[in-house]
Amino acid sequence: MKTIQLTFLFEDTGFCKDVFQSVNQPYYYCNRDTVDGTWYTSTPDDYQNDCRIRKDVIIEIISDGQVIALDGNGDFEGKKPFIPFYTFREQLAQAFLNKHPGVHSYEDMKQKLLFLPSGGALL
């Protein structure tokens, strides 16, 4: 299997994709569909999906010199898909709501924080 290394460039929520850039020059770009997780090569000027990346390609997502995800269109041992920020944010919010079922609004959250030890110092 071939391995490529990419870094996260930006999230394009309007077109439901995350845009990545290769670690090494010459730079090339790839997109990951945030709905179904499919990877595509991308045009360099406006980041349009070009071709679907082959299933035998492993994509290493690099951040601060570390591999944070192993992803790709195929199935392989050790696959650890990239989690888009909006998904992470939604999962975090849902986990908080599950833990604190009485919190339904910003005002509820503010009241909850005020009753924590030294909660007044937060505001």
Regions found by a protein language model. Give the residues of each.
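Acidic, low-complexity, intrinsically disordered interaction modules
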Residues: 13-104
